[in-house]
Structure formats: structure tokens, C-alpha cells
Amino acid sequence: MVASRLAAGGLLLLALLALALDGKPAPPQPLRKAPAGGTTAWRRELTEQPEGASRPAAGGGGGGGRSGSKAANAAPTAPKSKGGAAAAAAAAARLMRDLRPDSKQARAAWGRMVHPEHHAGGGGGGGGGGGASRRLKGVAKKGLGKGCFGLKLDRIGSMSGLGC
């Protein structure tokens, strides 16, 4: 009953949408051709700036530090000298690297989104993880080794579901 009313409402909305458009399809958009130079041409296209962007940004904070967000750091600045062109190319390369969907960081972020319960683990250095990922020393290390079946107690209950 509810499904039929929902379907009828959807059809009514589609009919009203068709009347609002007067049956005219949208004009076709011309296809944009890819540059012949591949990724090099894309980088060149990214470094080209419109006329309005050639002025320096307000605030004067143009240092080379990495304290801002990635989007602020990736924005190409106007070249001031011959070295400025290299800086603009580096900014464009950084933008391309950040937008790449198959990078290591993107895969790690996707894994954390899909499996949030496994994020507390964590491997080597570089932070992240939480308190469970630090190595135990001294007495705590000796007590941890003799668990169920000679395996670590924290692994048995959490991952396999065996428990002791």
C-alpha cells in the first residue's frame, strides 16, 4: 500500500518535471579534448593562471612553511623570478599527487573508514594507533608471553573469538 503511494508520487513528480522543462532537452556540451602531451600538458595547464590571479595574495603570508592546509599550500603562486616557475611546477605536482585516488594515504584512509575498529592497531613509527600499539617492557612483557596456548592474550580474545 505504502509502496504504491510512493511510486505514484514519484511518477507525479517526474510528470511535473517534464512540464517544467517544456520537453526541451539540455543543449549538448562540447567534449573537451585531452592535451596531446599527457600528464606533462596537464601540469602545464594547472600552472597557467588567469589574469586576476597574477596579483599577490592579501595578508603577505607567503612563507614556505607547511603550517596551512593542503589546499592552501597546493595553490600555485605567481612566479616572481626564474625560480618561481619551478615553485609553481612543484605546487602543481603536489596538487596532482594529492588528487591521486590510488595513493598510499588514500588507501589507508579508506581502510580506516571501512574498518574503524582496526584503527587502534598500528604498525611502526609515525604516531597514530593509540596506547595499545606501544611495546611493553620489563615485567609487563614477561607476563604477557604466557597466555592461552602460548599466544598473546590481547590477540586471542579480540580477533579469533576463542577467548580463554
From Swiss-Prot:
Residues 68-93 have a biased composition (Low complexity). GO terms for cellular component: extracellular region. Disulfide bonds join 148-164. One of its GO terms (biological process) is vasodilation. PANTHER family: C-TYPE NATRIURETIC PEPTIDE (PTHR12167:SF2). Belongs to the natriuretic peptide family. This is C-type natriuretic peptide.
